[in-house]
Design a protein with these regions (language model features):
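Sec/Tat signal peptide C-region and signal peptidase I cleavage site
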Residues: 17-21
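Hydrophobic transmembrane alpha-helices
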Residues: 192-193
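A conserved hydrophobic position in a structured secondary element of the catalytic/binding core
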Residues: 164
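Bacterial N-terminal signal peptides
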Residues: 6-15
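Positively charged n-region of N-terminal signal peptides that target proteins for export
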Residues: 1-4
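Cell wall/extracellular polymer interaction/catalysis modules
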Residues: 22-159, 167-187, 196-252
């Protein structure tokens, strides 16, 4: 009897979790700006996904940011890999190439992050909060203040955040909210200094010949970039005790 009860409880917990996730989008529509975005963009999104043979709503999304190109790529789940849905330009930008290491340094972070929260009443229209500082950032900034409150948002104004056009953040926000409602609890946001093709990466390293720590950091990011480029599957990464990003398993 006890195994049966345990199994039933497990089923109830799974059902409750799925119901809560599915309610997420409905709750978001209770906010004026999200409702406006939904009313103006949902039919277009549905049509575009259908024309491209993509499932709607998306079961998962993945964001890649390239600072030098001012580019935000949004990928969506397609079968067992990811398909590029759209490439957005970001219009508000501060700092230079390289990671964020201190409060007030104006830098847009670089590394492997996740969306931690949705802000439907942002001062910048709509925003997605990132988990900066992550484990790697905290190790590299021990004894200092790494800063925080890093978002992807609208209004084309930025001090260390990723800012896009208002209609673009509406679309990104809706698709991320759809994926969250479909059960994706961790929405990855990978931020690179530039598109790390072999040619561009070699040129990037030539700019930091006397900065081996920065060159090593960018080499870690390239490993994650290359892993995704091989099969369009989001790589699994971990942070080791020294703060280095490591690929898990056979992705190397």
């Amino acid at each position: 009897m006890r195994p049966i009860i345990t199994a039933l409880l497990s089923i109830l917990i799974v059902c409750a979790t799925e119901s809560h996730a599915q309610d997420f989008y409905r709750r978001q529509l209770g906010f004026t700006r999200v409702k406006y975005a939904h009313d103006h963009l949902d039919s277009t999104l549905r049509r575009t996904f259908r024309e491209r043979g993509l499932d709607f709503p998306p079961r998962a999304v993945y964001l890649r940011v390239f600072k030098d190109e001012r580019s935000v790529e949004l990928w969506v789940r397609s079968a067992d890999s990811m398909a590029l849905y759209r490439d957005y330009n970001f219009c508000g930008y501060s700092g230079t190439l390289g990671p964020k290491r201190a409060q007030g340094d104006m830098q847009v972070p670089e590394g492997f992050y996740q969306v931690t929260h949705f802000n439907p009443t942002s001062s910048y229209l709509l925003s997605l909060g990132l988990d900066y500082p992550n484990a790697a950032d905290r190790i590299h900034t021990r004894g200092g203040n790494p800063g925080g409150d890093i978002y992807m948002h609208g209004r084309c104004v930025s001090i260390g955040c990723i800012s896009v056009q208002d209609n673009d953040i509406r679309e990104i926000y809706l698709l991320a909210a759809r994926a969250r409602a479909a059960g994706q609890q961790r929405i990855p946001v990978h931020i690179f200094p530039l598109r790390m093709t072999e040619t561009r990466f070699a040129g990037l390293l030539n700019t930091v010949l006397e900065q081996p720590t920065l060159a090593d950091f960018w080499t870690q990011l390239k490993a994650g970039y290359d892993a995704f480029e091989r099969n369009h599957r989001i790589p699994t990464l971990r942070v080791d005790p020294s703060g280095r990003y490591r690929l898990e398993g056979r992705q190397r």
